[in-house]
From Swiss-Prot:
This is Protein arginine N-methyltransferase PRMT10. It comes from Oryza sativa subsp. indica. The gene is PRMT10. Residues 1-21 are annotated as: Disordered. Keywords: Methyltransferase, S-adenosyl-L-methionine, Transferase. The active site is at E142, E151.
Amino acid sequence: MASLPNGAASASAASSAAGGGPAVVDKEVDFANYFCTYSYLYHQKEMLCDRVRMDAYHSAVFRNAHHFRGKVVLDVGTGSGILAIWSAQAGARKVYAVEATNMAEHARELARANDVADIVEVIQGSMEDVVLPEKVDVIISEWMGYFLLRESMFDSVICARDRWLKPDGVMYPSHARMWLAPIRSDLAENKMEDLEIAMHDWNLFVEDTESYYGVNMNVLTKAYRAEHEKYYLKSAIWNNLHPNQVIGQAAVIKEIDCLTATVDEIREVRAQVTMPIKLDMTRLAALAGWFDVHFRGSKQNPATQEVELSTAPDVNGGTHWGQQVFLLTPPLKVNEGDNVKVSFTMVRSKENHRLMDMEFTYELHESSGKQLPAITTKIYLE
């Protein structure tokens, strides 16, 4: 998750194309709410310590050095500058490293310290506003957010591609997929317990306020509970799952070709999938979402060695992205041979285009032929 702001111009166009979605993005507000985090070294360190992330990008660049040798590279949202430095070390003639935040100065320092300052030019600013002196052969970016599309940074990558990538250029990564899978988990019980503790505390507060100050706050109890139900039960939960928590077949709900994708294609994601249950006598407590990206080059200019970066549950540990857990309330008892049918919709929040609102309609088709009524739930990826 690198740092680069979505310009007001592109956001306005996105809103117009949607027929009235989010308002035009205020860059100062967007920076304060989102990008400022990426200006801190502690946050950059968290990403740089993610071995899965680092190994995938390092392998993609150096195992496919022919894409970089003697070429012009654009790093969108360079952050610490690590991808720009690798691109230079792989033989790039010139690297333009665009960064929105003051992390740009640290990126310049790292380029100098690693003897590539003559190749890597760090440009602080919005990708939508930056003007390069030439077209580029490669666009490299670590733009992925939770469940791939949270943060909406891919918009800026698309803008960069459409403005600056040569017709025979390549994207790093070149492809991406979003996955959904049925899981078992105790998170629902834990979150329900947290909710009840919060409500118990509220009830004591109501009693004390009336007792000490003569004001009855009980009229707000319903709103307080709804607020906390959203937080505890209807918000996506970050988790690093173990593979044995996945109780059925995972399904791809979205595939993206980074060379051709448009903002319209990613502004709203819709899918209908059927996921067979593979474990007997268990409970479907939630759905889990993750993503993978691939470095394949292009048809005209393929990679010598394809590399995959996956954020799927892994016995060897996870990534800083983890997986997103979407609680299903109520959970369902399931058996091997049952099928879970899910209709999924994800759209950008009207309040903040970097956050996502999701709706799941799920129904269980038992192996006996019995079909349970469909249940619809809303989940917020914030």
